[in-house]
């Protein structure tokens, strides 16, 4: 019979809290500009930890920022999953809803979406975050005949490019109707995947689950 892991002692809790604080600080820097040139001292000060604590957790800034991106992408992917898995089953609707939820999350989860804006393109084929979830939905859609027969990774690349364009549009043109832009781009993506035009338009505008925190 499996047993639960023993509770962390005080030292282990403090160590875990320090690591989380460093990752949180790195995420803030990434969200602000995408720049990774901040000094270790600046990161430690933002995290409110001692300079020497940094090297107890990370060998370099690169390792820290990689961990921060992975942490943000995992949280982003989980947020999408929480609102769609078990609620939406149609692969086409999952793809469309993912686009539209991302646009909404620019308001409800701005830090996550800003990190996606600055760092998402290089992680389109990552094994972390939203990429494996999107690939899962594409593969299901192709296997079921919902989407046209195509190479799933190529389809994922095309979808990722459109999603990143939507994110950039959301921040660079706040005057535009983000909901409408997301629905339009979701519709075009579904058509690209082989969904008939009229159906793509309808699917891309179905009611969405509510995002926590809205």
Model segments located where?
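Amphipathic alpha-helical packing segments from all-alpha helical-bundle domains
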Residues: 74-81, 96-97, 101, 119-168, ...
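Residues at secondary-structure transition points
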Residues: 9-13, 17, 59, 63, ...
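C-terminal peripheral helix-coil segments that are non-catalytic and often amphipathic
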Residues: 1-6, 136-144, 172-214
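Helix-turn-helix
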Residues: 21, 29-63, 67
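Hydrophobic alpha-helical connector segments
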Residues: 63, 67, 74, 78-114, ...
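Short, hydrophobic secondary-structure boundary micro-motifs
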Residues: 39, 113-117, 150, 198-203
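Secondary-structure edge/capping motif, primarily at the C-terminal ends of alpha-helices
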Residues: 83-87, 116, 166, 170-173
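Generic hydrophobic, amphipathic alpha-helix propensity
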Residues: 14-26, 43, 68-76, 134
């Amino acid at each position: 019979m499996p047993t639960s892991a023993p509770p962390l002692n005080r030292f282990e809790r403090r160590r875990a809290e320090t690591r989380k604080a460093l990752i949180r600080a790195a995420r803030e820097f990434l969200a602000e500009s995408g720049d990774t040139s901040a000094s270790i001292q600046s990161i430690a000060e933002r995290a409110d930890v001692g300079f020497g604590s940094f090297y107890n957790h990370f060998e370099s800034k690169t390792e820290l920022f990689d961990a921060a991106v992975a942490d943000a992408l995992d949280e982003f992917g989980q947020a999408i999953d929480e609102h769609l898995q078990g609620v939406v089953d149609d692969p086409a609707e999952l793809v469309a809803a993912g686009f539209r939820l991302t646009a909404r999350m620019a308001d409800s989860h701005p830090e996550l979406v800003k990190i996606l804006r600055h760092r998402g393109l290089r992680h389109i084929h990552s094994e972390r975050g939203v990429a494996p979830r999107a690939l899962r939905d594409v593969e299901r859609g192709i296997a079921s005949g919902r989407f046209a027969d195509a190479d799933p990774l190529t389809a994922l690349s095309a979808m990722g490019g459109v999603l990143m364009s939507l994110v950039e549009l959301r921040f660079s043109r706040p005057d535009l109707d983000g909901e409408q832009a997301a629905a339009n781009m979701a519709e075009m993506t579904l058509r690209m995947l082989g969904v008939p035009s009229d159906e793509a338009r309808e699917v891309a505008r179905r009611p969405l689950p509510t995002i926590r925190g809205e």
